Structure formats: structure tokens, C-alpha cells
Amino acid sequence: DFDITTLDQLVDEFDRFEQVTLGEVEAPETERERAARVYPFVVDAVRPERVRIAYTFAAVLGMTDDTDLRETMARRSGHIPEGTPEWAVADALDRVPLARNWAVRTDNAYNYRLAETLPAVEFDDDTTAALADLADRIEADDPDDEALQEAIYGTARDHGVDVGDFFTAGYRLFLDEDQGPRLGPFLAALDSAFVVRRLRLEG
């Protein structure tokens, strides 16, 4: 039987193969020549403007059914560059339901749903203050994924909140779960105004 657990790795291999064909990554000449011969047979048309969303990130996008939010997240994360043709945007986002099905069928680390309304949560005063502080930092700096990941650690320490508990608070707020994907990159991809409101427990 075909094991779909590592399907994301197979898709990553195809994406790299495509990038080699289009000269987007370095590769030995023999690999480039082989890719150039084979590639036209595995796509409907050779279109250099085509955009691919990493399969695991497509699974993250699948945590919401809001198609506009999916596109916003893909753009904010850099998976859809500025100037991408509309057909290429639609083509890239077609990968999302496939990745969502993969996450659900394998019940892997991406099998979560974005809580689109504020879950019923209660935090102690220190955690609530830390969440509000993190909201202020995001509102002021709009950090990228790694900077936000570090800000989460730093904010927890600044307020004397256990780091693990602070991450759990974040997952409860945004996924209504106790765990989930890397929180910084996940929040960085969301609309910052939405993230700020949720961290302030406003909706």
C-alpha cells in the first residue's frame, strides 16, 4: 500500500524538480538537463509564473475554510509574491484542500482548525498581561515568523509566565487546542489586526 504519511516530502521533491527546471535553484548540469526533458510531460503547460505553496503550509492554510483568509496568509508568509497573476494565485491555492485532506487522513501535526471566534478561555492576570504585551509588540513591529517566535518566548519570560504555558495559551486562543504548529510562523501568517484583537481577548 502507498503510505501517504510522507506525502509532503514527495510534493517537496516535485517542487524542487520544478524549480530546477525553471532555473530557480542551483543543480548539477546533468540534473538540469534531465529535468528539462521530463518536466513538460508532467505539467499541463510550462508556465514560469506558476507559484507553488509548500505542502505543509498549504495544510496550515487548510485550518480555515475562509478562502480570502487563506490568500491573505499565503501572501503575508511570502508564498504568493507581489505581482503574481490571478490564475497563478488560484492555481497555488488549489493545493490547500488536498493538503487539508492529507492532514485529516493522517491526523498529523497540521490537523487543526482555526478558531474563528474567541474560544471560552480564562487566564490568570500574568498570562493576560503577557498576551496584551505580545499584542502591543505585534501592533508596533509586525514581526516576521521567526521574530514573532522569539517575541513569544521573550514576552513570557518578561512576565514570569512559564513558556510552555504561554504557548498553550496561544494555541487555546487561536485553535481551541492545547498544541498545534509552530506558533510564531502561524500567527505571523494571519492578519495582524485579527491576531492583535484575539490576543487582547476582544474577539
Write out the residue ranges for each language-model feature.
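Catalytic adenosine-cofactor/nucleotide-binding cores of aminoacyl-tRNA synthetases and other
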Residues: 1-104, 175-203
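Aromatic-anchored, charged helix-turn/loop surface patch used as a conserved interaction hotspot
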Residues: 93-142
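C-terminal accessory/binding modules appended to enzymatic or scaffolding proteins
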Residues: 123-171
